[in-house]
Amino acid sequence: MKKSIVFIFCCLSMFLSFGQENNADIGSEKVLDSLYREDQFYVGVTYNLLLNRPEGISQSGFSGGLHVGFIRDMPINKKRNVAIGIGVGYSLNVYNHNLFIDKEEGTQNTIFNSLEDVDFSTNRFATHIVEAPFEFRWRTSVPETHKFYRIYTGFKLGYLFSFNSNFKDPESRIKQTTINELDRLRMGITFTFGWNTFNFHFYYSLTPLFTDEALLGQETVGLRPAKVGLTFYIL
């Protein structure tokens, strides 16, 4: 009888001890889960394209972009692998092409011409944009590892706060920074997917770079940027 009582007491002690450990683990998981976020800082590099080009306009050389920012990750499910992201960032973009941009002498009117048959060494423009990305985020992440699949889709709103064009040929160099025909309000859709460190990123602008007042002959200049590249996330 005594042996039976001792055996039952030992079993109960082990059971209670196991239950306390499980409760402690569950409690720690809840605390960790309530704080878990992912992919809040980003750095991206892209190859830049100009779509919807007027006749006679083409890109030449390499056109690239650098993008950095912070996105606040706001999970919307218990596993915290589905989230909404809202943030702020900066985007630098350089485009090499044969669209000549200058000012009509004595006026503020902008001249747009094709350099299709002109010998030049440099012709490009750069844009500096402050952006607000909005994303719907899905991932296979857990707090213990940074290696997981992700699919993020959304859009970016932006403001083009600085523009400069640079033309150089053997005889002259022309720079322009004030272009009235710029469409400074930017909006585009985004799609990012990948695993671990390497994530492919796509961007397509819903608004042209130039307003309808920018003309090349009788055709609007337009130009819709598209970007293809890699995005790297931190924290």
Feature-to-residue mapping (PLM):
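Extracellular/periplasm-exposed beta-strand and loop segments of Gram-negative cell-envelope proteins
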Residues: 54-61, 96-105, 111-127, 160-188
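Predominantly the C-terminal beta-signal and adjacent terminal strand-loop region
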Residues: 177-235
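Short glycine/proline- and aromatic-enriched beta-strand/turn motifs that initiate or cap beta-hairpins
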Residues: 20-73, 231-235
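Glycine- and aromatic-enriched membrane insertion/assembly motifs of diderm outer-membrane
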Residues: 49-50, 58-115
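Residues that define the transmembrane beta-barrel architecture of outer-membrane proteins
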Residues: 37-39, 60-66, 82, 126-132, ...
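Short loop/turn motifs that connect adjacent beta-strands in outer-membrane beta-barrel proteins
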Residues: 27-39, 75-82, 141-149
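Residues on the lipid-exposed face of transmembrane beta-strands in outer-membrane beta-barrel proteins
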Residues: 68-74, 88-90, 132-138, 153-159, ...
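Structural signature of outer-membrane beta-barrel domains
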Residues: 48-50, 89-95, 156-162, 205-209, ...
